[in-house]
Structures are given as structure tokens and as C-alpha cells.
Amino acid sequence: MYPVDLHMHTVASTHAYSTLSDYIAQAKQKGIKLFAITDHGPDMEDAPHHWHFINMRIWPRVVDGVGILRGIEANIKNVDGEIDCSGKMFDSLDLIIAGFHEPVFAPHDKATNTQAMIATIASGNVHIISHPGNPKYEIDVKAVAEAAAKHQVALEINNSSFLHSRKGSEDNCRAVAAAVRDAGGWVALGSDSHTAFTMGEFEECLKILDAVDFPPERILNVSPRRLLNFLESRGMAPIAEFADL
């Protein structure tokens, strides 16, 4: 098991069922050292208000030896790469994930989807693109992976895509992993948990990575320090409370 999980939702996204405290308790049981709460951005119908994200600054950094990153799974809004995260939200958040979600950006043709994703990557506002292997959104995988490597943005392999959602993602995700490997980029693993019980589960992700001989040294979840080094390379100030994770 890797000790870092970068994608999960709480009851603040009302189609999810666990609290921050639930995730902390589960992290202690499973040996997770660092995790990110990434509730849906406010343009989603059941997402929290933008004040929710601004007020995450009151969260403790570490509880019972478990580090907590303040994050969001923002929505890509248009071909210009705009996302539903702005202003004071950026000041409170450590980790910005962004991806396509049908209620905000409906599936388009391959060229349009690719343009929107690359513009989001190039914006400098995001750290990870969520579930880029979603078969509903055809993209130029090679072009996206090369843009992500250039701009130091990780592409996610999402465990939920192989279990509960985005049916038919396997082939696309293998292609994404292979393209990231060839481009020398980063992969992030996300459980995409909507209940704490699936936190840290990456078994299906690892099957995808193994199938393409993906290099472990390019997986962000291998250690808290690797993930923090990545975020600091993107401009995040070092967080003193995480020094001993």
C-alpha cells in the first residue's frame, strides 16, 4: 500500500458519505500518512459553497500523526482552461485537482476536449488532472501527456474508474500511463473515495501501471516527501507540520 491518497470526497459533496474525522480514523488503521480531501468544485450541483474551501484554512495540519492536505477537485469549465476555483480559494488550498464532469463541461469532440485539458494544464493553476482516461471524453493522449510533463502537472490513474464509475476506462488509462511514462511525467493515484472504507485502495491502478512497466520513481504517492517535494516545486510553501511525516 502507498501511504498517500490524493483524491477523496466528504459529506460536503452530498453524494459522498464520510467526514474528515472518518478519513482520519481510516488513515490510522490503514497506515496512510498523508491524504487530501478534494471535494467537488462549486459549479457542481451538489458541491459545497466556495466559502467551504476558503475556510479549510482552519483545519489542523496533522491529527494523530496523519497529515491532511486541503484540496479541491475543480471542474474544467471551457476550452480556455478555466476552472471553478479562484481568488481566496487558491490562498487556502494546497492541492488543486481539475477534471471533466458532465454537468459543467459536456463531452465534445476529441480536438475540443484536448484543447480544454491542455489549456487547463498550461494555466499554472492545477497540480493534477483527474481521471483523464474517462472514455466519455476522447483526448489526444500523447499531446496531453507531453503538456503535463512540460508544465509539471500529474495525470491521475483513478481506482474508482475501474470499479464504480467511468466504465470502460481500462484501455484509455493504460494509454495514459504509457504516454506519461514516455513523456517523463508524473502519475498520481487516487482512490476517489466517496466513503472512507475505500481510502488508500489502489489495486486496480497498480494493475494498469504494471501493464506498461511504469517507473515507480514517477508515482507521487510513494511517500509523503515525494508528494510534498512536487508541490513545493510548483510553488507551495513548505509546511512545517509535515516535516516528520
UniProtKB/Swiss-Prot annotation:
SMART domains associated with the record: POLIIIAc
GO molecular function: phosphatase activity; zinc ion binding
Top enzyme class: hydrolase
Highest taxon in the source lineage: Bacteria
Cofactor (UniProt): Zn(2+)
Binding site for Zn(2+) 2: 15, 40, 194
Pfam families: PHP (PF02811)
Note on cofactor: Binds 3 Zn(2+) ions per subunit.
One of the record's GO cellular component terms: cytosol
Recorded family membership: Belongs to the PHP family.
Protein's UniProt name: Probable phosphatase YcdX
Natural source organism: Escherichia coli O1:K1 / APEC
Name of the gene encoding the protein in the UniProt record: ycdX
